[in-house]
Every structure is written in structure tokens, then in C-alpha cells.
Amino acid sequence: MEWNTFFLVILIIIIKSTTPQITQRPPVENISTYHADWDTPLYTHPSNCRDDSFVPIRPAQLRCPHEFEDINKGLVSVPTRIIHLPLSVTSVSAVASGHYLHRVTYRVTCSTSFFGGQTIEKTILEAKLSRQEATDEASKDHEYPFFPEPSCIWMKNNVHKDITHYYKTPKTVSVDLYSRKFLNPDFIEGVCTTSPCQTHWQGVYWVGATPKAHCPTSETLEGHLFTRTHDHRVVKAIVAGHHPWGLTMACTVTFCGTEWIKTDLGDLIQVTGPGGTRKLTPNKCVNTDIQMRGATDDFSYLNHLITNMAQRTECLDAHSDITASGKVSSFLLSKFRPSHPGPGKAHYLLDGQIMRGDCDYEAVVSINYNRAQYKTMNNTWKSWKRVDNNTDGYDGMIFGDKLIIPDIEKYQSVYDSGMLVQRNLVEVPHLSIVFVSNTSDLSTNHIHTNLIPSDWSFNWSLWPSLSGMGVVGGAFLLLVLCCCCKASPPIPNYGIPMQQFSRSQTV
């Protein structure tokens, strides 16, 4: 037991020695009272949505945003100036144009009976596609896919005739402004480092070019720097309208030719005091990877942030219901709305599918009596953002004679039950299926398609019927003729035979 305690103490010392800590004893005259905590606003609504980022997702791909509360107990704050490198989802550098490259086998199967009747079935088979093959085929032109003519052999079943096709489907994906990685729900784990990018569909790769390096324009904001009273350790920086920037594990990194402080979540900031003097000088980062972060990242390891598990549990329950039932209601979908302003994922329903894309969420501080408009933190009144002319809006909103906002409607004593109506979700089809059908079976490597009628397939089913009837009729007629034309046996004679005598003979 004593040895275990000794090794535990040594381990704690090692961890503390390897964790960069920023300490600062702020002058008493600079300490200010900061009462505002990072509270959940009345509502959050998406703005600056990038339409081309919205793609259909399966229920299993839904993800609950992290909910948290920021408590300033035991901290003192000093006013400071913070330079922040913002990441806007509307930036032109945040997208990459490309296309999906498919490799599939179009198969025609023919079965022929004794009488010539034929059954023709068309199917599409997913074909394996290697990364190198995707690279080689990406720059080539490919013909539009088609099924081969059937190969039918008398009294043979399941005669296959295959043809393999490559073809392209245009697709724009998101790009991480920091790491230059490609982001899309269709990718394995939703992220890809370099093109070609493998998708969760076998035989489908995304191919595109990485945009040129781009350095966002920084913004200078007035905020506060927070220090713990007992050890004078700097723990966070806060600016109104932004999520707290944790500094318990902060370090410095060079990006776009400038030295930045990399926060606990990976944001890049600079902290300066009055007159532009530098206030923080953390150690150099061991991990210099820079990637785009948002307001919905994991705050659970930060000591000064308390995760709001009540709201998160509601979202997890909604996710469980949607996944188990294959149905979704506006109320359930509203649980996936980020409750804090900043970059986030927005959802809406379209033709039985859940669409998800990138938006900037802004805080709503007031809603007018008829819910036609909302007021933002800068006292600007705005109209609710709609998805084209659909009645289903972002995060479960329903537009109609009355605007229904599930997270507001749930507080009414008499609420609109329309938000509780569940609708069936349709499967997200394989990309190849758009050429032949609207349904697919993604649970196997075989894409099932029903019999696809065409001119020649119809003729193949008609003539065997006529020929079969002719064969049967001819055989019956031949049997009748054979029976009728067969020679009859001689008729037996039962009379008394008469003898023939010569004329000269007297009887």
C-alpha cells in the first residue's frame, strides 16, 4: 500500500511537471468584478448556413452537442484585450469541390425454361475500388453506366452477364481551415486527411483538390482574463458572445507566420493588456497540430467547466428513440440544437431524411409575441431563417399558420401536439442507386434492385409465351393426326364359304 502511494505521488509530480501552467498575480487595482457566467441563452438560431454542406445522414450518424455551464467561483478577473482568429463556415476557403468516383458491376441474369420462357433480372453489385485505382481513374472520362444485353441459354438458369463501370458524381465537402482536412459524414469517421477519401460505401471514393492555404482575418475583442485566487493560475479568457477559452493547458504555436496561444480546445488567440503589452507567455506546444474547433467540443476535462448532463441526457434519449424506431418528430430533432452560440451543426427534415450541415449559431435574447421575429445580443431584430419554402425548418421548427418552436412550445400549458407527430425515415440510398432505383440495401455488399422494365426485356418475356403456346398446340395437333391416320385392321367374315364349280360339272 505504501509503495502504491509512493508511485502515485511520483506520477502526479511527473504529470504536473509536463503540463504547461501559466501563473499571474494581477495587481489589486486591475481586478474587476465579473458576474456574468456562460449561461444558456433563451434560444439559439442558425445563421450564415452553408447550403452546400447539408447532406442526408442516417440516425446512427446523429451526434448530441455538449452542454456546459461556466462558473466563476474562486476566480478573479482583469480586463484585457483578446485578438481572436475566427473560423467562419461561410468562408470560401472552407469548401473543396470534387466528385465521388464509383466502381460498380451491372449484372443481367437470365434463366430459360424447357419451353423457352425466360426470366431476366437486373442487379447492381458493389465492386472493390482501391485508393490507387481511384487516383488513376479520377482524371479519365467514363461512359454513362448501362446494363449489358442478356445472355440466355436454353434450359439454363442464372446465366450472368456483367459489365463494370466507373462514373462520377459531383460533390462539395467541407475543409478544416486550420488542418486542411476534408470533412463530410460520408467519410470514414467523418474526416479525411488527403484525397482520394474513402467513404462508408464500398467502391466509392471522393476525389478533390485541397484549396490553397488561407489565413483568416483576426478580430480584436474586449474581454476578461481569469485567475484562480489560491495559486494565481490563469484558467480562461472570456469575451461576450464566445464560448470560454480554457487556458489550463495553453501553449504557443506559429500559424500563418504569427505566434498564437493555442487554447485547451485548439482555438488561436492572443492576449494583450492596455497599450498592447503581452500578458501571457506559455510554453511552446509539443503537439503543433492545428484544427478547426467550435462551440460544441468536449469540455468535460476542463476543471472550471461543469457539464450540463440534464440537457445532454434528453438529447441522448432522443437519439436512442430515433435509432430504435426509425422515426423522428420535430420535438425529438430539436434536441440536437446547440444551446450556445458559435459554429454548430444544424438539422432539418426533407423527404423523409435528416439533413445536416454547418451554420453559425447566434444567441436569441427575445422573441416577439407572435414569434415572427427574434432579437439578437446586439439588439437587432431578425426574421427566422427558413429552408427554401418547406414547412419544416431548422432544429424542429414548423412553419405554418402558427410558428412552432419545440424548445419554446414545450413550456406552454397547452402545447401544439403537431411537434410530437413521428414520421418514418427512409434509408439513405447508395450513390449508384440513383440510376436504377430509389431504394437499396446497405447492410450487405449487394445492391438489390427490382426488375427494371425496358423494351428488350419486355420482348424477351412476350415471345417465349407465344412460342411455348405454339409448341404445345403443335404437339397436340400432331398427336390427333397420328391417331386418325393409323391403318384400320380387316373386318372378319363369318359367312359360309361358297365353292366354285366348272360349268360342265353337275351337282
UniProtKB/Swiss-Prot annotation:
InterPro entries: Rhabdo_glycop_CD, Rhabdo_glycop_FD, Spike_prot. Keywords: Glycoprotein, Host-virus interaction, Membrane, Signal, Transmembrane, Transmembrane helix, Viral attachment to host cell, Viral envelope protein, Virion, Virus entry into host cell. Glycans are attached at residues 30, 378, 389, 438, 459. The keyword Chaperone does not apply. The chain crosses the membrane at residues 462-482. The keyword Transmembrane helix applies. It comes from the Viruses. It is found in: Virion membrane. Residues 21-461 are virion surface. Pfam families: Rhabdo_glycop_CD, Rhabdo_glycop_FD. One of its GO terms (biological process) is virion attachment to host cell. Residues 483-507 are intravirion. Residues 1-20 form the signal peptide. SUPFAM superfamilies: Viral glycoprotein ectodomain-like. It is a single-pass type I membrane protein. GO terms for cellular component: membrane; viral envelope; virion membrane. Belongs to the novirhabdovirus glycoprotein family. This protein forms spikes on the surface of the virion. It is responsible both for the binding of the virus to susceptible host cells and for inducing the uptake of the virus by the cell. The interaction between the internal components of the virion and the portion of the glycoprotein exposed on the cytoplasmic face of the plasma membrane probably directs envelopment and virus budding. This is Spike glycoprotein. The lineage of its organism: Viruses, Riboviria, Orthornavirae, Negarnaviricota, Haploviricotina.
